[in-house]
Amino acid sequence: MAKALEQPFDVANIPGPKMATLLEKGKPVANMIKKAKRPLLIVGPDMTDEMFERVKKFVEKDITVVATGSAITRFIDAGLGEKVNYAVLHELTQFLLDPDWKGFDGQGNYDLVLMLGSIYYHGSQMLAAIKNFAPHIRALAIDRYYHPNADMSFGNLWKKEEDYLKLLDEILAEL
């Protein structure tokens, strides 16, 4: 039976009455990516090797990817430095809040933001800012941790790595 609610990974991270809808399957995420005009995947440094292998597949499927923090070094080492953007997470958040931002390619802001691998408390603050100040963006946390400030989030799967990777694989299979 599906869980109605998930507890935030950081138990003090209770943002109020509106919390992320729990995602338990990958297909709805893939459908949202396909429907989005401009999806953006934000990748942070808290990523396992297996997660990185999946993120490389998002790059191959022409999803705009931005690496934050030291995550960019993994892409450079894998020969993908030219296909991935780099930004400081806090500055990127400020750009995303501006509906007139032109994006990394000059084509406009993004309507769907997916996040994985960010340090939990950094990602949580980014998602809180988007939730409260960027009505033009839908935010999904496809991370190993439940992020209540996202519109939708995977549950706490940090102890269930295989289950988490299967969800990422489901998304990729549908794209």
Swiss-Prot record:
One of its GO terms (biological process) is methanogenesis, from acetate. It comes from the Archaea. InterPro entries: CdhB, DHS-like_NAD/FAD-binding_dom. Part of a complex that catalyzes the reversible cleavage of acetyl-CoA, allowing autotrophic growth from CO(2). The alpha-epsilon subcomponent functions as a carbon monoxide dehydrogenase. The precise role of the epsilon subunit is unclear; it may have a stabilizing role within the alpha(2)epsilon(2) component and/or be involved in electron transfer to FAD during a potential FAD-mediated CO oxidation. Heterotetramer of two alpha and two epsilon subunits. The ACDS complex is made up of alpha, epsilon, beta, gamma and delta subunits with a probable stoichiometry of (alpha(2)epsilon(2))(4)-beta(8)-(gamma(1)delta(1))(8). Belongs to the CdhB family. This is Acetyl-CoA decarbonylase/synthase complex subunit epsilon 2. The gene is cdhB2.
